[in-house]
Curated annotation (Swiss-Prot):
Component of the larval cuticle. This is Larval cuticle protein 3. GO terms for molecular function: structural constituent of chitin-based larval cuticle. GO terms for biological process: chitin-based cuticle development; larval chitin-based cuticle development. The gene is Lcp3.
């Protein structure tokens, strides 16, 4: 499923601007993993490496219409898809009272 998403993402990058030229293209598939890289002359790029266990590490980046360089790195493994970027939303910090309550509960487990 992830490979389909990666291929569709690459196709969308290429289809976004018909006048974009490929600067670098690498697709090296081996029995123990793969390396894939695509660099376009408009600043868009994608790269990924995968191993025999299905773990994938990658990065994709582009220049937004506002001129902002967007970069997303990710890991896909037994814990699922884990993207990281300064532009991705993050949850608010856990309030101190909640952390204190969790610590109390862990220190005083139920006797049932």
């Amino acid at each position: 499923m992830f490979k389909i998403l990666l291929v569709c993402s690459l196709a969308a990058l290429v289809a976004a601007n018909a006048n974009v030229e490929v600067k670098e293209l690498v697709n090296d598939v081996q029995p123990d993993g793969f390396v894939s890289k695509l660099v376009l002359d408009d600043g868009s790029a994608s790269s990924a490496t995968g191993d025999i266990h299905g773990n994938i590490d990658g990065v994709f980046e582009w220049i937004s219409p506002e001129g902002v360089h967007v970069r997303v790195s990710y890991k896909a493994d037994e814990n699922g898809y884990q993207p990281q970027s300064d532009l991705l939303p993050t949850p608010p910090p856990i309030p101190a009272a909640i952390l204190k309550a969790i610590a109390y509960i862990e220190a005083n487990p139920s006797k049932n």
